[in-house]
Amino acid sequence: MAAGLFGLSARRLLAAAATRGLPAARVRWESSFSRTVVAPSAVAGKRPPEPTTQWQEDPEPEDENLYEKNPDSHGYDKDPVLDVWNMRLVFFFGVSIILVLGSTFVAYLPDYRMKEWSRREAERLVKYREANGLPIMESNCFDPSKIELPEDE
């Protein structure tokens, strides 16, 4: 009885898949216990004819795995010898040239915002004022006799 119910439910499943347009597997199953045969019924419908277009191989395969041919590939070239040399060149120029010469360039950049110059200039003025007996700092930044004020009206 259970085998008969299984055969009936399998036929219903195949028929439902065929009516909804789902691909139904063309399976024929035979039970070894009850000798019940489950096969797709005629209700499942016929498959639509397959397209008649000719299959053509892609002239340039996009998903070629370079690691199958060269397990030590660095991703620069398909040829293993060129791949190693390209990797060496990239690392030589990337590390040696850019890091070494780049850090040398940054080290010799001019004084940023003239901090060092302003410090040296202040020290020079302090030494000059101490040597001539002048006060180190004055209350007036500008000479008051040289400032021209507008007349009061």
From Swiss-Prot:
Q: Where in the cell is it found?
A: Mitochondrion inner membrane
- What membrane topology does the UniProt entry give? Single-pass membrane protein
Per the UniProt entry, the disulfide pairs are none
The region called Disordered is annotated at 40-77
Is DNA damage set as a keyword in this record? no
Q: Name one GO cellular component term.
A: mitochondrial inner membrane
- The membrane-spanning stretches of this chain are 89-109
Q: Does the keyword Transport apply?
A: yes
Signal peptide span: none
Per its UniProt entry, which superkingdom is the organism in?
A: Eukaryota
User: Which ranges are annotated Basic and acidic residues under compositional bias?
Assistant: 66-77
List the keywords (alphabetical).
Electron transport, Membrane, Mitochondrion, Mitochondrion inner membrane, Respiratory chain, Transit peptide, Transmembrane, Transmembrane helix, Transport
- Where's the transit peptide located? 1-29
Function field: Accessory subunit of the mitochondrial membrane respiratory chain NADH dehydrogenase (Complex I), that is believed not to be involved in catalysis. Complex I functions in the transfer of electrons from NADH to the respiratory chain. The immediate electron acceptor for the enzyme is believed to be ubiquinone.
Subunit structure, as described in the record: Complex I is composed of 45 different subunits. Interacts with BCAP31.
UniProt lists the family membership as follows:
Belongs to the complex I NDUFB11 subunit family.
| Protein name, per record | NADH dehydrogenase [ubiquinone] 1 beta subcomplex subunit 11, mitochondrial
Which species is this record about? Gorilla gorilla gorilla (Western lowland gorilla)
Q: Which gene encodes it?
A: NDUFB11
